[in-house]
Amino acid sequence: MSDFSMETLKNLRQQTGVGLTKCKEALEHAKGNLEDAVVYLRKLGLASAGKKEHRETKEGVIAALVDERGAALVEVNVETDFVANNSVFRAFVTSLLSDLLDHKLSDVEALARVMSSQEPSLSVEELKAVTMQTVGENIRISRAFYTPVNSGQSVGIYSHGNGKAVAIVFLSGSENQEALAKDIAMHIVASQPQFLSKESVPQEILEREREVFSSQVAGKPQEVVEKITQGKFKAFFQEACLLEQAFIKDPEVTIQGLIDRAAKASGEPLRVEHFVFWKMGA
């Protein structure tokens, strides 16, 4: 039987911001004494982290990893760029990628509850508290992404600005086109497409753009309106859709043309299945 009440456990959690499991452990170690339990958690580097959680986090890093378990992406924010480049903080971020891959998670709240691969005796939330204590700043896990990597896929990652923007590209049709996938990922970071193709643009976006274009040419003959609108849509697709964009390394060819050229050279039916692009704070 426990030496503490549920009310004491609740008070310890509210006072320290530490997870349920570690609070129970602290109270058991302290034989139900609240003050001793707080001291115990402080010695573990957990108890003072809660005081930092209100601080604003504008800096940080976006990190990505692809291996046999799949592809993972995580954005973790801190208060200053100095800590964003701290080795302790970076090690914590790297461990999150492994946790996402191990548990196949894309949910930040679910990630916080799993046991950390970096420190198996602590949950991710508890390790975050320890890391906050070590670096002296608030840490926020903002978003997470996981997807399996299938056979016959090539995956490319490109990171810009030491993790300020990251793209992952998934090519189907070959497992040997990582260089092409990385080139396209680099292009995505530079050109920031909103959609994969013309066909993937939502209907409401098309209708919005058509209204804007029509208002710009109001009063002109219908055939002129149609011609101008078609031209404006072409320009819109070339700016917003990855496959229609001019390749950043060779503007004479579109991304679709680049893929077609690689497919012809390799004899493999290549296509971009999807991509993920994250920019810090966006």
Swiss-Prot record:
Its main location: cytoplasm. GO terms for molecular function: translation elongation factor activity. CDD domains: UBA_EF-Ts. GO terms for cellular component: cytoplasm. Residues 80-83 are annotated as: Involved in Mg(2+) ion dislocation from EF-Tu. Transmembrane segments: none annotated. It is found in: Cytoplasm. Pfam families: EF_TS (PF00889). Disulfide bonds: none annotated. SUPFAM superfamilies: Elongation factor Ts (EF-Ts), dimerisation domain, UBA-like. Keywords: Cytoplasm, Elongation factor, Protein biosynthesis. Associates with the EF-Tu.GDP complex and induces the exchange of GDP to GTP. It remains bound to the aminoacyl-tRNA.EF-Tu.GTP complex up to the GTP hydrolysis stage on the ribosome. Belongs to the EF-Ts family. PANTHER family: ELONGATION FACTOR TS (PTHR11741), ELONGATION FACTOR TS, MITOCHONDRIAL (PTHR11741:SF0). This is Elongation factor Ts. The gene is tsf.
